[in-house]
Regions:
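Conserved SGNH/GDSL esterase-like catalytic core that processes O-acyl groups on lipids
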Residues: 36-40, 46-131
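Short, mixed-charge, low-aromatic patches
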Residues: 13-25, 48-58, 86-94, 134-137, ...
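Alpha-helical cap/lid subdomain in secreted, periplasmic
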Residues: 2-3, 93-232
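Low-complexity, intrinsically disordered short peptide segments enriched in small/polar/basic residues
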Residues: 6-8, 34, 71, 76, ...
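N-terminal secretory targeting modules
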Residues: 1-42, 46-54, 62-71, 102-105, ...
Length: 232
């Protein structure tokens, strides 16, 4: 009995650690109220909030919700390890979360994705990425798209060339950011250049060189907030 209880506590404690540090993969979407402006934050682990302490409060969509207040409803549709490209190992469009983000009928879609596309096993090339990015964005219909470039990726002490942690290729990340800028101009989307901002603020990115820190998540939320307030 004691052994079973101890095991349960261990498992429960382990899950709690994963949950509160943004590693459980659990969703935190809720229902919007009538009259609220709906904001769907779509993306990968950057949007989800991977590795951020006290994740339920400190992922960037949660911070954005607090900044915007009751007149807005923000849902986090970020899913770690997923990618734009349909040929990748984990295409975002194959997810139930993707279908849920469509059904949410958002007024604004804040889209930030591409880090996992940069992995050697996923990267097919600029044309394929551009085509699949356009397909994804167009699937949101009449929603206003706020298109964010992905955060800059940095080499670390353990990863000094070609590929950094999580198999991310910083040079390909730079290329993906440029493609995203071009797509925003082509489609007339609102652009937030998170890639350029994070390049100037290494402290916005955690020690792994890839994921935003708590400070970085707050900075991203502030940038999105500034745009939404200007729009409304």
């Amino acid at each position: 009995m004691v052994l079973v209880l101890s095991f349960a506590i261990l498992i429960g404690g382990g899950f709690a650690y994963l949950y509160f540090n943004g590693m459980s993969g659990m969703s935190n979407t809720t229902e919007a109220k009538d009259g609220q402006i709906r904001i769907a934050c779509v993306g990968d682990s950057t949007t989800y909030g991977h590795g951020i302490s006290n994740w339920p409060k400190n992922n960037y969509p949660a911070i954005l919700q607090n900044l915007l207040g009751e007149g807005y409803h923000v849902n986090n549709y970020g899913v770690s390890s997923h990618a734009v490209q349909d040929t990748s190992d984990r295409p975002y469009m194959n997810l139930e979360h993707y279908q849920e983000s469509l059904a949410y009928d958002a007024d604004y879609v804040v889209f930030m994705m591409g880090s996992n596309d940069s992995k050697p096993e996923n990267w097919v090339g600029a044309d394929a990425f551009r085509e699949d990015l356009l397909t994804l964005l167009e699937s949101y219909g009449d929603a206003e798209i706020i298109l964010c470039t992905l955060p800059s990726a940095f080499f670390t002490d353990e990863h000094t060339e070609n590929v950094t942690s999580h198999d991310i290729q910083p040079l390909i990340v730079d290329e993906i950011a440029q493609i995203t800028r071009e797509v925003a101009a082509e489609k007339g989307c609102i652009l937030i250049d998170i890639h350029a901002l994070t390049a100037q603020h290494r402290e916005w990115i955690s020690a792994d060189g890839v994921h935003p820190s708590k400070v970085g998540a707050a900075a991203i939320a502030q940038e999105v907030y500034n745009i939404l307030i200007k729009e409304n």
